[in-house]
């Protein structure tokens, strides 16, 4: 873990990264106090290279089920905050009003895509193969963008498109489709 963190610190410094995101994609159960301490330590380390740390939370994480759970970990920690991902927010049935009620500075990064509310696929299969170009699914993208902006987040939004069909496109076509799909919601 230490070696990986050092590599990420060096990379963030070289690239001048605005932020990184971390989370519990493997779904390990942990005590909230332990997670908060670790998040604070990582945030302090990355402050040395002027890179914010965002906590991304997932449906498979048994420690975070709500915005309030996530805020219990990040609130009051300098150089850290939430990293919102529409995909996970929809799959976790996060109330967008809770996002809108966050304070300026609570969110350090945000990414979106489109997808389907319900499928018969496993979490992993759906996550890597059904994150669609915005406008090609049924996610309430405009509502989520509005809520995220209402929270005071005024940084650029990222796209995270992971789908089998998207990976088959040429780079030129993929970039254009991503740009056109994403920009219609911003």
Where are these regions (language model features)?
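Active-site acidic/histidine proton-transfer and metal-coordination neighborhood
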Residues: 1-81
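Soluble or luminal CAZymes and related metallo-dependent hydrolases
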Residues: 3-4, 34, 38, 136-140, ...
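Amphipathic alpha-helical segments that form well-ordered structural scaffolds
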Residues: 11, 41, 143, 147, ...
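Conserved, mostly hydrophobic/aromatic
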Residues: 12, 53, 85, 110, ...
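Gly/Pro-rich active-site loop or hairpin
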Residues: 32, 64-71, 88-154, 163, ...
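Conserved hydrophobic residues forming the short capping helix/wall of the S-adenosyl-L-methionine
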Residues: 46, 74-77, 148, 182, ...
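C-terminal helical cap(s) of enzyme catalytic domains, especially alpha/beta-barrels
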Residues: 168-186
């Amino acid at each position: 873990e230490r070696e990986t963190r050092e590599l990420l610190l060096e990379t963030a410094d070289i690239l001048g990264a605005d932020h990184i995101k971390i989370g519990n994609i493997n779904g390990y159960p942990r005590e909230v106090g332990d997670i908060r301490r670790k998040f604070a330590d990582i945030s302090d380390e990355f402050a040395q290279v002027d890179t914010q740390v965002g906590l991304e939370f997932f449906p498979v994480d048994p420690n975070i089920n709500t915005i309030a759970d996530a805020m219990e970990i990040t609130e009051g920690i300098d150089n850290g905050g939430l990293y919102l991902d529409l995909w996970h927010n929809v799959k976790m049935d996060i109330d967008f009003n809770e996002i809108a009620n966050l304070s300026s500075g609570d969110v350090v990064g945000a990414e979106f895509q489109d997808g389907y509310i319900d499928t018969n696929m496993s979490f992993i299969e759906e996550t890597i193969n059904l994150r669609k170009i915005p406008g090609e699914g049924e996610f309430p993208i405009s509502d989520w963008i509005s809520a995220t902006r209402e929270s005071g987040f005024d940084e650029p939004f990222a796209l995270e498109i992971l789908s089998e069909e998207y990976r088959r496109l040429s780079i030129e076509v993929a970039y254009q489709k991503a740009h056109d799909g994403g920009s219609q919601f911003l």
